[in-house]
């Protein structure tokens, strides 16, 4: 079963959107297997955004993700990576489709509420960076047979 990493950024937490964001993934039929509420350290932020280290916006990414609490999550399900990207919407909320998280609630590209892994390799790396194996729960909701063939 495929897994992805999602993080509700400080703006999503401060605006009280945690429940709404989680609801969207639960009602889609995905299974939450890891969840933590944390203040991100500068070191973790720099590791997470390491691919952008040489980009001019890198310092602002690190500053923002460490500016307040974050909800880190691991979700599981068939096609969860691609589906999560659709649920989240385009990176820039101004171009994100209505009905997506960013389209409905996003303000601007610097305050776009949520991060989601963009590929299986990235998801695996991010899950391992943010969670230990002991922090992930292997379980199956009773409704799983009704959602998957």
Curated annotation (Swiss-Prot):
Documented EC number(s): 2.7.4.6
SUPFAM superfamilies registered for this protein in UniProt: Nucleoside diphosphate kinase, NDK
GO CC annotations, alphabetized: cytoplasm
Main location: cytoplasm
Active-site residues, as the UniProt record annotates them: 115 (pros-phosphohistidine intermediate)
InterPro entries in alphabetical order: NDK-like_dom (IPR034907), NDK-like_dom_sf (IPR036850), Nucleoside_diP_kinase (IPR001564), Nucleoside_diP_kinase_AS (IPR023005)
Residues that coordinate or bind ATP: 9, 57, 85, 91, 102, 112
GO biological process: CTP biosynthetic process; GTP biosynthetic process; UTP biosynthetic process
Cofactor: Mg(2+)
Catalytic activity: a 2'-deoxyribonucleoside 5'-diphosphate + ATP = a 2'-deoxyribonucleoside 5'-triphosphate + ADP; a ribonucleoside 5'-diphosphate + ATP = a ribonucleoside 5'-triphosphate + ADP
Gene Ontology molecular function, alphabetical: ATP binding; metal ion binding; nucleoside diphosphate kinase activity
Keywords: ATP-binding, Cytoplasm, Kinase, Magnesium, Metal-binding, Nucleotide metabolism, Nucleotide-binding, Phosphoprotein, Transferase
Cellular compartments annotated: Cytoplasm
Enzyme class (EC, first level): transferase
Annotated family: Belongs to the NDK family.
Subunit architecture: Homotetramer.
HAMAP family on file: NDP_kinase
Primary role: Major role in the synthesis of nucleoside triphosphates other than ATP. The ATP gamma phosphate is transferred to the NDP beta phosphate via a ping-pong mechanism, using a phosphorylated active-site intermediate.
Protein name: Nucleoside diphosphate kinase
Organism annotation: Nostoc sp. (strain PCC 7120 / SAG 25.82 / UTEX 2576)
Gene behind the chain: ndk
